[in-house]
Amino acid sequence: MEVKPPPGRPQPDSGRRRRRRGEEGHDPKEPEQLRKLFIGGLSFETTDDSLREHFEKWGTLTDCVVMRDPQTKRSRGFGFVTYSCVEEVDAAMCARPHKVDGRVVEPKRAVSREDSVKPGAHLTVKKIFVGGIKEDTEEYNLRDYFEKYGKIETIEVMEDRQSGKKRGFAFVTFDDHDTVDKIVVQKYHTINGHNCEVKKALSKQEMQSAGSQRGRGGGSGNFMGRGGNFGGGGGNFGRGGNFGGRGGYGGGGGGSRGSYGGGDGGYNGFGGDGGNYGGGPGYSSRGGYGGGGPGYGNQGGGYGGGGGGYDGYNEGGNFGGGNYGGGGNYNDFGNYSGQQQSNYGPMKGGSFGGRSSGSPYGGGYGSGGGSGGYGSRRF
């Protein structure tokens, strides 16, 4: 005889979830990268178990790891947790602030390898740039689309000052940086029937900061390592300026150090007459994404600051330079096969960092070292 639950009590859905998520315990339609959080500012006393004990309150964890120095086994001050579905990640982020072992920590959505090479990828911002919108797209179209991600503060559809014609891009500001992080993980969005590209909107000062950090990264020419601009080619973006051009993101008017918008090229000339988003060293500046810079968290330099590193966590150690992965390797499935068993990265072979310093991630995900940027010589 089947025993039915009391009225009003939700029935368990574990069987349905298991079927939906498959044998590995997660939804096969949701990539691991979207289910993963970087946890910064950890106490050096925090262990895998205590980190798991805290974050499993918001869902099922398929992986949880505190990164440690492979020699000393001391915590590096950060870790990763991976949930079984994106809904659980959202729940954990909605529950901020988080305190683990008596210390307030900083969770952020993990940045993929491909996105990590972009200037400002690790900056905390509340504004996005929406490019490639068409003449028939109005403010309400943008609001209808983006309000499902979070609370919108302002929307600016940019127009030409003289003609009043739309310039093919807009800015949307939210009340929470996590909303931006969640949106930019999905690079392309269909708005009012048109494919649009969405990026973090960086001010002129933030662009210059990102450019100066890249300049310290070494390597020859931009993020790819062996020359070649980030953009390349010369296709038009939006209605006018070159998106890639020969100066990378700077476009025709930007030259090899083209700016984010700066005048003639860039995002459709976006920034124009001395606006905040014009000028600066640009997306195609030289060098890797490394060097000093502003802090990502609360224990030192930036993502490549000071002694390098993911916030300079663990007193100057960096995300690769102090042996993030030590001698261990990542395989094509993002499984870490070194001294700490986990599966938190979308890596493709090679040592995660070696023992190099001078740039974050120790010369790149796929490199064994070197002083290049995030993927300097093997991208």
Curated annotation (Swiss-Prot):
The modification Phosphoserine is found at residues 14, 43, 112, 116, 351, 359, 367, 371, 376. There is a cross-link at residues 4, 36, 118, 134, 151, 182 (Glycyl lysine isopeptide (Lys-Gly) (interchain with G-Cter in SUMO2)). Pfam families: RRM_1. Residues 35-118, 126-205 form the RRM domain. PROSITE patterns: RRM. The keyword Ubl conjugation applies. The modification Phosphotyrosine is found at residues 361, 365, 374. Residues 1-34, 204-225, 335-379 are annotated as: Disordered. The modification Omega-N-methylarginine is found at residues 52, 76, 214, 216, 226, 239, 246, 257, 355. The keyword Membrane does not apply. The modification Dimethylated arginine is found at residue 52. GO terms for molecular function: mRNA binding; RNA transmembrane transporter activity. GO terms for biological process: mRNA splicing, via spliceosome; mRNA transport. GO terms for cellular component: catalytic step 2 spliceosome; glutamatergic synapse; nucleus; postsynapse; postsynaptic density; ribonucleoprotein complex; ribonucleoprotein granule. Keywords: Acetylation, Isopeptide bond, Methylation, mRNA processing, mRNA splicing, Nucleus, Phosphoprotein, Repeat, Ribonucleoprotein, RNA-binding, Spliceosome, Ubl conjugation. It comes from the Eukaryota. This is Heterogeneous nuclear ribonucleoprotein A3. It comes from Rattus norvegicus (Rat).
